């Protein structure tokens, strides 16, 4: 059977369209947004959106792709933040990029340490183990003054950031810095989940006993998931402290943040790279939408001081809906909508 000229050219046209779409998106996010977005959008929406997307990527490595449940995401973020802070303060000669990588490496080492129980336990018991990491790390940073450079206040001002001559002090520069780091790590994530290690993670997630039978080193595969997940979370934690909060403190990495990151991957889609953006957008925008709808909600008898409780109710309801009706999250819904739209276009 011979292919027609149109059938041969179709894949090339598709690749060209994807390339042009990627270039257009790059121009918008790297050039258009810094030029046109105001400081509120950059500081309060876009920067936390990018960092939480990155944190979702880290947790997705562990939970979405490798199937290891965790409630300690914020703990590993705090390790990365404190490690990077100490490197910046104690070894000022190191470039910022090296500080971030070393902070992520320290977080990866701690992640492997708390991942050791995964060699023996799973499910609910593993969740409890990672939850212990959350409480232990916060206690450690609160009680041991060395981590906070012997500062008695417990709240450290984030040091000024710079990469060579570039001073990262304005909202636009912080946005571009976070965007650059997120772009690199997401590109790394795409390559990783398509690699042999990514396939091993999914085999362990689906059935670790069968994975062991076919020769996959289950223990090492799980620990690599903890290491790489914590590495990304550690870098996200440093960005969270330096580019968003402006401070380094244990309260900035509480259990609520761990739940938020878990909600991101459940709502966005476990085992999905793009779903991290969708879940993070939902987590960041929902409180803003509820706050802006305070007047309309007040007419329904919902007081303004009850908005936070309403937010929790909405999150809880959506978690149940997605787990029962669509475990693959918003990413799957978007994919189905795109397939229907392209099918209509071809008719």
Question: Model regions: which residues?
Answer:
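Transmembrane alpha-helices and adjacent helix-loop boundaries
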Residues: 1-347
